[in-house]
A protein has these predicted regions:
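Phosphate-binding loop of NTP-binding sites
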Residues: 99-202
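N-terminal leader/targeting and accessory segments in enzymes
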Residues: 1-104
Length: 202
């Protein structure tokens, strides 16, 4: 099912995460296919999230050149970014709510794949990786990589992507992409490490 920008705007507004949206007159016809906060991996139809202490307005320019159809930003950057992209649909959150808005937008754009997975989060000071790997082995039994996706500091496997991650708990767009991949591949479980730092961000 194709999702549209108008639906995302309504979804975030219902959760009181948007201060306002601008240049969204055609939102009902703008299809969404993904969301990212890294301008280097933006694809056509993606929403670009303008975030981070090191964010530069040039990142938005780059994202738009590679196909971003809208952007999500904090209120403190809205005027600066509108000057760069005066006709591009903008979703504006308070500075305090930007991370939550990014997480909720990521869930919406990927179709809430967590609803079709059994989610298992593992946190603690020591033993998260060991526990996640043992749990996957138990759940998969004699069929490795057939039932259980994993996200952790040692390995990420979602049925499509497989490798070593950059962070124990990825940013929301990446996390939800892995969940969506696991759902697409028919996996049943997601065993993921959850860092204590990630839990601080609500």
């Amino acid at each position: 099912m194709t999702l549209y920008l108008s639906g995302l705007i309504s979804y975030l507004a219902e959760k009181n995460l948007l201060v306002r949206s601008k240049h969204c007159e055609d939102a009902a016809t703008i299809a969404l296919y993904g969301i990212d906060h890294d301008s280097r991996i933006i694809e056509p139809g993606h929403v670009f999230v303008c975030k981070g202490a090191a964010f530069k307005s040039e990142f938005l320019k780059s994202a738009l050149e590679t196909g971003a159809v809208a952007y999500l930003c904090a209120e403190s950057h809205a005027a600066e970014l509108e000057a760069i992209a005066p006709t591009v649909p903008a979703l504006i959150a308070t500075d305090a709510n930007l991370r939550r808005a990014m997480a909720e937008a990521s869930a919406y754009v990927t179709g809430h794949p967590d609803h079709n997975l059994t989610m298992i989060g593992i946190t603690g000071t020591k033993g998260k990786s060991t526990t996640a790997c043992m749990l996957r082995a138990i759940l998969d039994g004699d069929e490795p990589y057939e039932k259980t996706a994993i996200m952790g500091s040692i390995e990420v496997f979602d049925g499509i992507e497989h490798g070593k991650p950059d962070n124990t708990t990825p940013e929301a767009p990446e996390l939800w992409r892995h969940l969506a991949n696991a759902q697409k591949c028919g996996l049943t479980y997601m065993a993921m490490e959850v860092s204590s730092q990630a839990l601080k961000y609500d």
